[in-house]
Structure formats: structure tokens, C-alpha cells
Amino acid sequence: MQLKKAFWKLASLLPXSLLLFLGGCDKKLAVLNPQGPVAKAQYDLIVWSFLLMSLIIAIVFILFTVILIRYREKPENMDYEPPEQHGNTLLEIIWTLVPVIIVIALSIPTVKATYASEEVPKESKHIKPVEIYVTSANWKWLFSYPEEKIETVNYLNIPAGVPIQFKLTSVGPMNAFWVPELGGMKYTMDGMIMDLYLQADKPGSYLGRSANFSGEGFTHMEFEVEAKTKEKYDKWVKEVQQTAPKLTEDKYNEIVKPGVVGRMTFSSHHLSYVDPKSLEYCDYNYYKNKK
């Protein structure tokens, strides 16, 4: 009886604890606020995984509670001795098959979502993606638009409703590019190009950040992603092409040196004199910065 009372007292504290926990959440978590097809697919996977694991936890705790109460030691069965058993084929089959089924139920949607994120979202297969090279440096982000022949630092403009093919690389320590409301993160590494497809469904401002610690300036590696209508995006590109200064090699080498900088805009990009696919990409910047 005392055990039952203690259990129900603890159970009654659960709703109050949950309310206290939720009281600290003054706004939506970015990861749980998908604003594009890639983020939506990953959000659905998170929800499915959470529900399945919650069901498993609930079943385990219910069985644990039932066994704890029903088969606890009582005064009337102090001398009870359970029969000797050498195995139960049915139970052994069940506790072998159930984990296999759980793993399959988690694996199939995970694999499908992972492979789907490595290409243009199926809803936008008919739309040509905008290609943007993303370069992480200590401690800033460079965004190069090869077709538009422009480059930005620490901010990014994209057209809404259009898939974006990001090509990720680095001129410093390994980093991770992440815009939580548009999709999952991916690493940036020297001498490598990693593809990442994202898309914003509607115009808006989304916060991007580094998801990999890279030293003292790590906290400054945030950037704004502004999704614009196609008309406003084209207008912005034209303005940059006509009014922004050129990005010279000297200026580029100054930017990639370790340090914190503000937003910058240029009417040319560093891809015209640096090949990010080359294994000498990192060494090029290292020796240039030593001069």
C-alpha cells in the first residue's frame, strides 16, 4: 500500500514538472519550425522517431510498474519458491524480434530521408537550383555566387521557392554550416566540396550559424539568410553587380585571416582566382596570409 501511495505521489508531480520545463520556452525551437521541404522531411523524421521511442519507453515503464506492484514480496507469500525454468521459447522469440522490428521501423524512414536530402527536393525537380559556394574561415562565412558573379560575407540572400545547391568548403578548421529552419547541418572541410540542398518555401529571415566549435571567435559565426521573392532577389543581384566593389586577391586574403568582420558585399568572387576543388586550396591561403 505504501509503495502504491509513493508511486502515485511521484506520478502527480510529472505534469507540474512538465509545465515548469515548458515555461522556459518563450518561442519555437528553430529545428521544430521547418520552413522548407528539406526541413519538413527532417522534422517528420524527428517526430516519428520521438513518438516511436516514447511508445517504447511508455510500454517499458508500464510493464515495470505492473511487475513491481503485482509481484512484490507480500507477508502471505514469504515462503514462495518459483518453479525452476530453463527457458521460454516464446518469450525469447518476442524479445529478439521486437528490437529488430523497432530498428527497421526507425531505419527505413531515416535512410529514405537521408538519401532524399542529397538531391533537389522532389517538389522542385523542375526548377533549376541556384548554386552558391559556402566557405568557412576563422571566424566568418563567405558566400560566392558563380553565375551571378558576386560574393557576400556573413549574410546570404536566396530566392524563395527555388532550391539552393550549396557547395561547402573551408579555408580554416573544419566547421559546420547550419540553417535550422531550412534543414540539417553539414561539415565544411579544406580541399573538399560537400553538396547540401536547401530551400525556403516563402520569403523571410532565417538565422544560420556554425555548429562546430572552431576557436575563440566561434560565437560570432552567425549569419542571416534572407529569402526574397524572385523579383526582389533579381533586383538585389543587379544592384550588387552595379554598385559593390570588386573582391581583389589582397582583400580576400585579408578577409580570411583569423578575426571577426562585419557584413561585406562584392561584385566579383574569389572563385575567379582560387579553385576550392584543389588540394592546394588551404595551403594557398596559408602561405598568402604568412606574407
Curated annotation (Swiss-Prot):
Residues 1-28 form the signal peptide. Its main location: membrane. It is a multi-pass membrane protein. It is found in: Cell membrane. Its EC number is 1.10.3.-. The keyword Membrane applies. It comes from the Bacteria. GO terms for molecular function: copper ion binding; cytochrome bo3 ubiquinol oxidase activity; cytochrome-c oxidase activity; oxidoreductase activity, acting on diphenols and related substances as donors, oxygen as acceptor. It holds the Pfam family COX2_TM. Keywords: Cell membrane, Electron transport, Membrane, Oxidoreductase, Respiratory chain, Signal, Transmembrane, Transmembrane helix, Transport. The keyword Acetylation does not apply. This is Quinol oxidase subunit 2. It comes from Bacillus cereus (strain ATCC 10987 / NRS 248). Catalyzes quinol oxidation with the concomitant reduction of oxygen to water. Subunit II transfers the electrons from a quinol to the binuclear center of the catalytic subunit I. GO terms for cellular component: plasma membrane. GO terms for biological process: ATP synthesis coupled electron transport. Belongs to the cytochrome c oxidase subunit 2 family. The chain crosses the membrane at residues 49-69, 91-111. It catalyses: 2 a quinol + O2 = 2 a quinone + 2 H2O.
